[in-house]
């Protein structure tokens, strides 16, 4: 029996007719629910056609309903995780989520500063579950060390208002531009503000806006109808998707639209694995055509046409407002292939590969 030797490195490299995917390093907490944190980042970045390099900054104890506790990783261990892979792999973008402690923020910020040309998407989750003193030191460190390096700061309207304009006492809510101005004072170039409440004209329903803004004004955004559905992991999904798109070279305006469309479809396909909140399904596009047709028939039989394209307030622990937008997502399903059962990502994502 003849045993063929594996290809050499040179032969393997020559056989690759496509460039490798964009590599995105994520700094985030470990979340055993798989809804957010590093697990959510890995799933989202992979679903977007990029490759995730997850660095764990904290261990969060939670279920799908609430956070119980967290244990920050030692700052030196965070740095060693990142430096080890950065010496080997070229990265295209950063995603920063919950970093566990002020010391963790400092360690990550020092690493980011060594790569000023790599775009950084920073997500500010709802940290109301963290002790007040610990929360304040964390936010102060994040404001001083991470914001100056941030291309896009992502967060819900309420969370970003509390973070950027803690003394806001105007009866009207702060605008996205005002939040961008406040972030810009610390060096952040853009904010992506989600869950901006809007009254619907001549309707008792409420709508939410998602707005990308700079200190000069609003740039782009999408309005979605609000639904009372609780999600967890939406904010990490949106910010990780945006980081993957920027890492792949997509311009910011287009990347925000595609990231919002991806979140919209992920939430529409979301599932409830336990007794708590709904988790986004980042691989909604991996459903085969036959399964899609079958589900559509079942929906029609039930009288529910499946038009609940959802989007949500993307806070890590308080995703309580889902919003729907029938026009925001790319509703083209997986294209036919020559291989039975094979599927491809939705068209909105396909240019990454």
Regions found by a protein language model. Give the residues of each.
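Conserved N-terminal subdomain of the carbohydrate kinase-like
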Residues: 3-26, 38, 42-129, 136, ...
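Acidic-glycine-rich active-site phosphate/pyrophosphate-binding loop
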Residues: 12-21, 37, 205-221
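Short pre-catalytic strand/loop immediately N-terminal to key active-site residues, enriched for Gly-Thr
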Residues: 27-33, 219-232
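Conserved phosphate/ATP/ADP-binding segment of small-molecule kinases
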Residues: 132-219
């Amino acid at each position: 029996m003849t045993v063929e030797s594996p290809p050499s490195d040179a032969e393997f490299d020559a056989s690759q007719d496509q460039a490798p995917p964009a590599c995105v390093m994520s700094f985030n907490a470990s979340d055993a629910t798989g809804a957010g944190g590093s697990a959510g980042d890995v799933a989202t970045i992979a679903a977007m056609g990029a490759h995730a390099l997850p660095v764990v900054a904290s261990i969060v104890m939670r279920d799908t309903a609430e956070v119980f506790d967290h244990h920050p990783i030692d700052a030196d261990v965070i740095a060693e995780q990142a430096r080890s892979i950065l010496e080997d792999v070229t990265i295209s973008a950063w995603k920063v989520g919950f970093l566990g402690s002020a010391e963790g923020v400092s360690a990550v910020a020092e690493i980011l500063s060594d790569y000023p040309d790599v775009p950084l998407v920073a997500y500010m989750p709802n940290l109301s579950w963290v002790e007040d003193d610990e929360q304040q030191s964390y936010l102060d460190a994040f404001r001083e060390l991470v914001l100056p390096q941030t291309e896009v700061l992502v967060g819900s309207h309420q969370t970003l208002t509390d973070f950027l304009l803690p003394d806001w006492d105007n009866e009207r809510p702060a605008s996205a531009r005002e939040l961008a101005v406040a972030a810009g004072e610390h060096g952040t170039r853009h904010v992506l503000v989600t869950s901006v409440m809007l009254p619907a004209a001549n309707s008792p329903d409420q709508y939410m806006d998602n707005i990308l803004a700079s200190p000069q004004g609003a740039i782009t955004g999408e309005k979605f109808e609000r639904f009372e559905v609780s999600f967890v992991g939406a904010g990490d999904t949106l910010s990780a998707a945006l980081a993957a798109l920027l890492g792949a070279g997509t311009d910011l305006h287009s990347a925000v639209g595609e990231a919002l469309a991806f979140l919209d479809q992920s939430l529409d396909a979301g599932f409830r694995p336990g007794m708590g909140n709904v988790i986004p399904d980042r691989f909604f596009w991996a459903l085969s055509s036959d399964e899609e047709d079958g589900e559509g028939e079942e929906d029609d039989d039930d009288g529910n046409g499946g038009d609940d394209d959802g989007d949500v307030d993307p806070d890590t622990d308080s995703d309580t407002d889902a919003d729907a937008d029938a026009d925001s997502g790319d509703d083209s399903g997986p294209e036919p292939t020559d291989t039975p059962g094979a599927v491809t990502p939705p068209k909105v994502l396909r240019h990454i590969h």
